[in-house]
Amino acid sequence: MVLEVPQTERVNDVDVFLSTQDGQIQRPKGPNCRHPVRQKCTNCLPVDPFDEEYLKEKDIKHMSFHAHVRKLLGSQGKGTTLKKPLENFRCSLKPNCDAHKPFPKGICTKCKPQVVTLNRQKFRHVDNIQIENQELVNQFLDYWRLSGHQRVGFLIGQYQPHLEVPLGIKATVAAIYEPPQHCREDGIEFLEDKNQKTIDNLLEMLGLQRVGWIFTDCWTANSAEGTVHYTRHKDSFFLSAEECITAAMLQNQHPNITEYSMDRHYGSKFVTVVASGDESMHVNFHGYQVSNQCAAMVEADILCPTLYTPELAYVRETPLSEEHYITDVQFSMKNEYGAEVMKNGRPLPVEYLLVDVPAGMPKEPHYTFHVGTSNKSKSAKFNVENRQAIGQLQGGANLIQYSSEFSKNQFLEQATNFHFLLYLVTNDQVQISDEWMKRLCDAVKAQDRGTAMEWAQECEDWHQLMALAHANGGSGNDVSDIPVIPNGDPFSGSSSGGSGGAVWNCGHCTFQNEAARQDCSMCGLPAAD
């Protein structure tokens, strides 16, 4: 029996691919070359992916992660056997030291972390964030437009090679999942997500994963013109200290699995996107990551936000417990005389913790998930999850209305909707088995119309879910648009059997019940009159 390694413990496919690439940047023969075509000189020899002059020429602020690894491997010399050059930052005590009693009764230089000197990170794990289409983010922003409250979501997609940066990686966003949250005009509070494992299982079936998170910070300037205030800039802040700490916590929850570290993980590819006003006072998207040093400080729980200055963080002075150790943190800056001086991290500017990641949309929009192409199919949209606060509910009438927009041979288009698939696995009425969901997800990934139609005809859980939706949400749809049981009749609102027969068919799920029963033994709904 072969056990499959979970997605969270596997080296990402893009890392496997990039590790096999040469990475050398080819340069054509230039005007200064004085040699035949087949020869090379210093003007046209290939350069390394971490070449500083090339990166500066192309205006690339940070080298890619794999270019950083190549630089470290190259600096060791060809005779070395060192293949794991990455070492994780550590800001907490090393546990289980045999040389002394546990802290605070004992400590030594082996288990004590070094003083942290903050440096701006020269590489980034992700070089670009590409949101597939405009409709994706407009649907996310609709919550703020309708309520005036801020919103947070997880970016769903995958990591792919980014050709514009040597050995680069881009996070491609195909959908946005909105978790349970308490939204306010000036903030957001995460709530417990009881469906987290179920959702991650669905993402694995779809070949996708959480690649980052997005939140809004929008303040209306003129509602008639649709403008928003420009609040995040070089004279204020780009990410607040509290947001940096949250980003670091999420990055620590989504480590970057790599074979180049003895710990088998180093940093994270998890990105942060902020939707806020830009110079033109329109909503724009800005991408970031926090540095590995920041993530290590947050993991050690030594970093906290300041009260009135969002651009400053603060290293704790008082331990949270007797066993909590706080290491010293310092950073260098120029004083009023232009000299480099070391400063204590109480407080420290969050700009030392940030790594910019460009975010945008492609010229040609792409749709991993869509809702048909006709005007009719766009008249009803399947509601986004966890939007009860603004009156948008999934299931019931919404499920009926959305399903009625598609004919029986358009079930593939109906199912190619992330929020619809999410509802199938998270609804509390009918639990659809993993086997059936895997079959549907495979059809969606391959865009296999025949398999999708077979699924709609054969999956009894889907039939029961639709029956309950009609019972709870009302039915006014054409019977031809309602799913059909193979070799049976369409679902209808009335019983096809009477009380005088030996059995009666439930008008909601078509299950045959004994005549003596007053309710259906399958779905529990009462017999129709």
Curated annotation (Swiss-Prot):
Q: Where does it sit, as one GO cellular component term?
A: VCP-NPL4-UFD1 AAA ATPase complex
| RanBP2-type zinc finger locations on the chain | 499-529
Q: Does the keyword Cytoplasm apply?
A: yes
Asked whether the keyword Zinc is assigned, the reply is yes
- Subunit organization: Forms a complex composed of ubxn-3, ufd-1, npl-4.1 and cdc-48.1; within the complex, interacts with ufd-1 and ubxn-3. Interacts with ufd-1. Interacts with elc-1/elongin C; the interaction may mediate the interaction between the npl-4-ufd-1-cdc-48 complex and the E3 ubiquitin ligase cul-2 complex.
The family this protein is said to belong to: Belongs to the NPL4 family.
Q: What is this protein called?
A: Nuclear protein localization protein 4 homolog 1
Origin species, per record, is Caenorhabditis elegans
Q: Gene symbol?
A: npl-4.1
